[in-house]
Amino acid sequence: MLMPKRTKYRRPHRVSFEGKAKGKNVIVNGNYALVAKEGAFITNKQIEACRIAMNRYMKRTGKVWINIFPHLSLTKKPLEVRMGSGKGSPEEWVAVVKTGKVLFEVKDTSNSEKVEMEALRLASHKLPIKTKIVKKGVQV
């Protein structure tokens, strides 16, 4: 699973995913990309599920770039525990995704647009947010 090797603080403040993405909103590597239409926290398991789905469909003919990484830890207190007594232990790692951020980029060596678009469509079903598939050169 994806998670940082080391962090400065174990339990950081929660970050807002409101507003538009400031960085990584341009397609750099691939021909097609999956772009977020809304903001959310995306967990390391969801990112991994997308990666597996795309790689399985494209087999060895394509390359996938993942532009998000789960840097933020979300904490949770155990069930049936009273309020207070600290924040709770880190439960999962999430990536903060804002509107317009390029999540995944795909390039197929056989230059088959169908394969690239289908791989991104399969990945979009694994995510909890609305996304759109964008071609390189088109405004995100």
Curated annotation (Swiss-Prot):
GO terms for cellular component: cytosolic large ribosomal subunit. Disulfide bonds: none annotated. It comes from the Bacteria. Keywords: Ribonucleoprotein, Ribosomal protein, RNA-binding, rRNA-binding, tRNA-binding. GO terms for biological process: translation. InterPro entries: Ribosomal_uL16, Ribosomal_uL16_bact-type, Ribosomal_uL16_CS, Ribosomal_uL16_dom, Ribosomal_uL16_sf. Pfam families: Ribosomal_L16. The keyword tRNA-binding applies. One of its GO terms (molecular function) is rRNA binding. Belongs to the universal ribosomal protein uL16 family. Binds 23S rRNA and is also seen to make contacts with the A and possibly P site tRNAs. Part of the 50S ribosomal subunit. This is Large ribosomal subunit protein uL16. The lineage of its organism: Bacteria, Bacillati, Mycoplasmatota, Mollicutes, Acholeplasmatales.
